[in-house]
């Protein structure tokens, strides 16, 4: 009898532990990781699928938990109402630490952090969309909300709607 009870307790404990582990993974994927929990963040794979299905461009942030520049950008980004509003026009992807893709397309001018890249709905990185008001040696480094907003507006203009479709209709032929 005691063995059965011990097995039930052990089995129940394992179920709870497994559930908590799965729940934590879901929460971490949805978490803003300091960049704003009010924004609907996706993983890279889910974000690419959603962008392709919805036709929305992707805004992708690559950062590290230990990075001072990343920590400085987080509250500026998270507190910006305009970034939050513009985020509705993008599939927002937030990659931290080991989530950073190894593909060179995601580090067009180096592997510094944080980097913000814009991708079209097919998942292609558009390296021409850069921080025009930043350091030309670090084209994808944004240090404040105004720079991010400017990049988002440029990406929205270049990667959505009829202008984007007209420039890329020949790509499919």
From Swiss-Prot:
Keyword Nuclease among record annotations: no
GO CC terms of this entry: endoplasmic reticulum lumen
Tissue and organ distribution: Ubiquitously expressed. Expressed in stomach, spleen, intestine, gill, heart, head kidney and skin, with the highest levels in liver, brain, muscle and kidney.
Gene3D superfamilies: Glutaredoxin
Induction: (Microbial infection) Up-regulated to the highest level in liver 24 hours post Singapore grouper iridovirus (SGIV) infection. 8.2-fold induction after 4 hours of SGIV injection and the expression increases up to 42.3-fold at 24 hours post-injection, decreasing to 11.1-fold at 48 hours post-injection.
Domain of life from the UniProt record: Eukaryota
Molecular-function GO term, any one: electron transfer activity
Motif (Prevents secretion from ER): 170-173
EC number: 1.8.4.2
Task of the protein: Protein-disulfide reductase of the endoplasmic reticulum that promotes disulfide bond formation in client proteins through its thiol-disulfide oxidase activity. May function as an important antioxidant, and may be involved in the responses to viral infection.
Protein name (database record): Thioredoxin domain-containing protein 12
The species this protein was found in: Epinephelus coioides
